[in-house]
Structures are given as structure tokens and as C-alpha cells.
Amino acid sequence: MNDITVTLPDGSELSVPADATVEDVAYEIGPGLGRDTIAGVVDGELVDATTSVYNDARVVIVTEQSDEYQRVLRHSAAHVFAQALQREYPDAKLTIGPPTDDGFYYDIASVDLDENDLETIETEMEAIIDADIPITQQYQSREEAFSKYENNPYKCDILETEAADEDPVSFYIQDDFEDLCQGPHVDSTGEIGAITLLNISSAYWRGDEDNDTLTRVYGAAFESESELESFLERRKKAKERDHRKIGQELDLFSIPDITGPGLPLYHPDGKKILNELSSFARSLNLEAGYEPVETPHLFRTELWKQSGHYENYVDDMFLLDVSDEEYGLKPMNCPGHATIFDQHSWSYRDLPVRYFEDGKVYRKEQRGELSGLSRVWSFTIDDGHLFCQPEQIEQEVTHVMDAIYSVLDTFGLEAHVALATRPEKSVGGDEIWENAETQLRSVLESQNIDYDLEPGDGAFYGPKIDFAFEDALGRQWDGPTVQLDFNMPDRFELTYTGEDNTDHQPVMIHRALYGSYERFFMVLIEHFNGKFPLWLAPDQVRILPISDDQLGYAHRIKNELSDFRVSIEDRAWTLGRKIRAAQEERVPYMIIIGDDEVSTETISVRDRKEREKQDVDLSTFHSHLKSEYENKRLEPDFIDMN
């Protein structure tokens, strides 16, 4: 049997027999690593340590020290849950139970559970873990598998789809429990240090609302009790910062049933924040040489066929029949921008050409996947597309990265960066891919940006740089992407005249500074816990007259601060109640005025940190507001600086 070459994470290569397992590869590297091997990652896929490698591949060995080990442990925790469930509810039908970032979920049918049942199941899970039951992989024939699941249509569905080419079929066994599964898993249940069941929700089989409704149970799993306790504390804080809760408290947005799922309504205060975000993005775009464009909400499907979206994305599109002609609400803005570029003749001297648009798009996500502002049907992208020569990629991506980091700095956000390179199936020649990836690496390294390399994770039409925002609680959220595109210019036959006086195809670069306004708004609500910086706050200053006697002075102050969003609290409340209301609404500044302030024509300033300064000259405070706003400082700092 011929040898194959496996490439290790450090780039070194190892020659092994063509049927070598992941564990064999580990022992070739060293006996200590071989003994510690839990699983492996082969060409990006997490697999069992006993999985054979038959072709040249990239191989990563997974041990208890690896990041991937957590997914293995949590997958095993899902099996412990399923075993405990079947002991308590033998008639329950198991479907799928994948790992998540903090634990797992398991979808089940034919059983009614409520939150009170979780404690009983959790107690049984702990008994299974304490028993330290070995977890082993076994293979069974397809006939045996179908016979085993003759009363479980969900497992039969898996056998007919994901496992259609498997014979024999992989199962994992632990004592009296077995499950159709590819793994990998830990060696025994005792390796799972700490678990808890979190909550129950509903889900559709396959995420399709036309299928059966299932019961979904979420759980958390960690190596130690201390890690679990830390997670539960973070989870508690996250619930307090939930953007849906704060959005309702501050009257920022709503998603009522009558409007339809995933279709948010922005209330006046929410729209004020979005306007500020849009204005900031617009200023960065204009400064970087982008020109504003606008495209309609729908196009004839001929455009989507030319762009390739109709072929690959039609199930996620909203289609309309208009006078016997088919139209589609746009799921993306890029075909419209490519069409604008195509309306002109371009020379190499004109490039790069840069467009930007706050473009509303529509994507038909499954209803079960919709969640607040993070997953919606209708959302707006601060979309930018630029068209350049291949040799201009590095300079243009550098400018985009500068703008993205300006956004991060402005909002006090951290980001994790990843470079995703050419996948197995791609369009475009070797030379243009190698040139593009080299230029992207050069940008990242010249700016000293730490990044993860994700081989093969690029889009089929070009490599990309992905950003994940990290908020105040250390959680990561999908952020901007800088995506090179060799496909759309080809589909639209976009050209420019080169120095050699012949036609050349430009490279298209997709980029957004926020990602989408909806998701970024969600991140900001939770990151700031509703305590927005002055420049974003919908109500920037609240004037609190002690009595109606000061209302005239209050209106004079409001007029002098007319370049800010100022309100007057004129309800017949005590001063204490007025202050509490402003605090609850996270207003950055309060101006308190009584008879003394009226007589001296001064103000008392209180910030939301409950600090106060008296005898303040209004013009001094006004000047400070301008400075704090223009510099987009994150916290109200008048008291600190005066």
C-alpha cells in the first residue's frame, strides 16, 4: 500500500501508510502524543482517533489541551443526557444532539417535558458520570441500523441522508445506551467534570417549520465545577444585558407578531441611534473615497440568475410574481453594485472604483432560527464594494482594515481575526488566488494583526478576512468580512481597459464596517448594557426642574443646547423620582435646576454614574458636550474634567 503525506499544523509533513489512523499519526510524531490523543481534525473535520486517513491531508491531533477537546467533551455530555433521558422516559424518541460553544442541545420527540423534569434527568446524568462508563465505537450493518430504529423516523431520516453512503454504520455505545453517531467522544463518561441542564425550548425537525415540532433541551458541560460556575455567572450577566429585554425597557425596537417574524420595527429612540451609526459609517466611507449609491429592494430574477444567487440561494429568497414576471427581494446588494459598475467604460486610471450603500436586504431564515435582532428576515448592511486591479488588492484591503479598526476603537470593542483561504472547489486560476492570499497575509502581518489561519474556509469565489466582535462579557459575535470575489466580475463580464489597451477583469472586494446594522445594534446594546456613549444616546441630556417654577428657565436651557437631544422632565414628580427615571433610562447627563440655579443663571450637572457638580456655567457644559460628542468618548466625563 502506498504512503500518503499528512501536513501538520506547523507546516511540516509526515509520510504514513494510506490506512493510518489519526492515532497512528500521533504515535509517529511521538509516543507521548499518541497516548494523549483523544481525536483528530482531518482537513477541517473533527473525527475519532480511530479514523483512517486514506489520502494526503492536513491533520491536527486533539488532546485534552486542545481547543477542539471541549467540543468532544460536550458531544459526549449530549450522549450522557440522552442515556439519562431514556432511563427516565423510555418512550422518548431521540433525534440529534450536537455540541455547542458551552455545552450541547438535544432534540427529542414523543415526550412532554417541563423545567421541573430537568432536575430528575440531571441527577441521573450525574450518576452516569460518576459510574465512569467506557464509551466505545461500534459498526453495524445498515439493515441492523434500520431495524433498530424502525419506530424512530428521525434516525431513519439520518440513515437515508447524512449516512446514506455508510455501510457499516457508526454507533457509540455506553453501557445500556447506544446512538447513531460519527463521534468523536471522550474515552469514558467520568471525563465530563461538570454538567447542568439549562432550559427547554421547541425546535422544528431539520429546522423546517413544515416538519414536526420537537422538544429541545439545552445543557452546559465543562471539565470542572469552577468552569461551570464561571459560565453560569457569565450567563446570568448576559441575561441581564439581553438586547431584547433592554430594547423593551428603553423603547428602542419591537418585533410584534402582527408584522411577521424577523421584521423589526425601530421606535424613535432606536432610530436615533441607527441614524448616528449610519452617519458615522458614511463619514468613514466618504473619507476613504467611496461614492454613495442606492439600489431598489427588488430586482427581476434575471439579475439573480446572472449573479448565481438564484441557482444557489433561491430557497432563502422572497420571490414575487408581478404581471407574470418573477422578481426577488434582494438577499444581497452586490449584484446591484456590479450592475452600476457595468453601466460605464473604465480605464485602469479610474480604478479603484468604490461604492457604498446602507442597503436593505431580505433573507428567508427558518423561523426557528430567528432571534431578536441577531437573526432576522429584514436587515440593513452598511455595504461597500470596490473594483480594483489585482495588484491593488493590498492597498485597498489596508484601507478597509484601517476603517474597521477605527470602528473597533470608537466603540471600545476587541476583535478576533481569521484569514480563510482557497477551498477545494473554487473559481479563478492558481496565480490570482496565490497573489490574493499573499496580499491579504501581507496586510495582516504589516499591521501586526494576530490572526487564525483557516485553510480551505474561503468562499469558492475568493479568500476573505473575517472579524468576530468581542463584547464586554468576552462573547464573540460575527462582525465585518473583507471578501475578495473573482466570480461576480466574471459572471457580469466586468472589464476595464489596461495599460496594454486590452480588456482586463477587475477584482471585486465586498466589505462592511459593521456587518449588519441589526446585529451590530444588538452587540452595542449588550456591550454597553444600554448605557450608550453621549454621541449615541437617544436622550443625551435630561433637564430636571425641581418644580414648575423653573420650567421657563428649563426651556431657555433646552434652546441653548438645541444642537443636542435634550428633554425636559415636567411631570409632577419629586426630584428623587425624576432622577431615578433618568437613571433607569441610562441618560448620560441630567441638569438639575431649582430657585438657586435660576437666580444665578447656573446649572447643577449630574451624570448617570451618580456624580454631581453644582454652580456650573451653561456655556462651559455646552462646550464640553461638543467635545465629548465630536471625540465620541465612551463615558460621560464632564465631572472628571471640570
Swiss-Prot record:
Binding sites annotated in the UniProt record for Zn(2+): C334, H385, H510
Listed EC numbers: 6.1.1.3
Compartments, record wording: Cytoplasm
Cofactor note: Binds 1 zinc ion per subunit.
Ranges annotated as spanning the membrane: none
Keyword vocabulary terms for this entry: Aminoacyl-tRNA synthetase, ATP-binding, Cytoplasm, Ligase, Metal-binding, Nucleotide-binding, Protein biosynthesis, RNA-binding, tRNA-binding, Zinc
Residue numbers spanned by region Catalytic: 242-533
Residue ranges of domain TGS in the record: 1-63
SUPFAM superfamilies noted in UniProt: Class II aaRS ABD-related, Class II aaRS and biotin synthetases, TGS-like, ThrRS/AlaRS common domain
GO biological process terms on file: threonyl-tRNA aminoacylation
Swiss-Prot/TrEMBL catalytic activity: tRNA(Thr) + L-threonine + ATP = L-threonyl-tRNA(Thr) + AMP + diphosphate + H(+)
UniProt-listed InterPro entries: aa-tRNA-synt_IIb, aa-tRNA-synth_II, aa-tRNA-synth_II/BPL/LPL, Anticodon-bd, Anticodon-bd_dom_sf, Beta-grasp_dom_sf, TGS, TGS-like
Cofactor section: Zn(2+)
Keyword Nucleotide-binding: yes
GO CC terms in record: cytoplasm
Main location: cytoplasm
One function term, GO molecular function aspect: ATP binding
Self-association state and partner proteins as the record states: Homodimer.
Described function: Catalyzes the attachment of threonine to tRNA(Thr) in a two-step reaction: L-threonine is first activated by ATP to form Thr-AMP and then transferred to the acceptor end of tRNA(Thr).
Similarity comment: Belongs to the class-II aminoacyl-tRNA synthetase family.
Name of protein: Threonine--tRNA ligase
Source organism: Haloquadratum walsbyi (strain DSM 16790 / HBSQ001)
Gene that this polypeptide is encoded by: thrS
